[in-house]
Structures are given as structure tokens and as C-alpha cells.
Amino acid sequence: MGIKTLIIFFHIFILAVLSSNNIILTSGAEIKKFSYDHCFHLCVAGEYGSNECFVDCAQKGFWHGDCANRTEKDPIRCCCYN
């Protein structure tokens, strides 16, 4: 193996390490937590989803709204928050 081949593999290795670090950093995005005190309507796929929830929450004076549940066993509801 020549010196050029070693240098090429070294650069590929460095690029791979740098790329994997970026993936880890971007996948660690912080999830915004909100209170479940303002959960109203059940979300049903194809009938009442995130868009409808957002509109309803905006009409109630909230800045945000999305379909969420506290645990996997709980039903998914439209929860509003600021």
C-alpha cells in the first residue's frame, strides 16, 4: 500500500467521523415539553389531525396545538399550549 492510498483512507476516515458526529448532534434536538392541562378533542387519523388541532387552539387563544398523549396507553388528544 502506498503513502497516497494511506492518506486517502485517512481522509475518508476523518470525514466519516465528522459526519457521524453531525448526525448525532442533529438527532439530539430538544423536544418541547408542554402541559397536558389544555387537551380537548380526540385526534382521529383522516378526520381530526394536527392541522385541525392547531386551528382550534389558535381560535381558543393559544399559540400552538398538536395531537399528543402522555403515555402510549392514553388516547391521542389535541393539546394546546403557548
Curated annotation (Swiss-Prot):
Coiled coil: none
Disulphide connectivity of cysteines: C39-C80, C43-C67, C53-C78, C57-C79
Residues annotated as signal peptide: 1-28
Keywords: Antimicrobial, Disulfide bond, Fungicide, Plant defense, Secreted, Signal
Entry-linked Pfam families: Defensin
GO terms under biological process: defense response to fungus; killing of cells of another organism
Top-level taxon in the UniProt lineage: Eukaryota
Main location: secreted
GO cellular component, one term: extracellular region
Subcellular location field: Secreted
InterPro entries: Defensin-like_dom
Similarity annotation: Belongs to the DEFL family.
Record's protein name: Putative defensin-like protein 48
Native organism: Arabidopsis thaliana
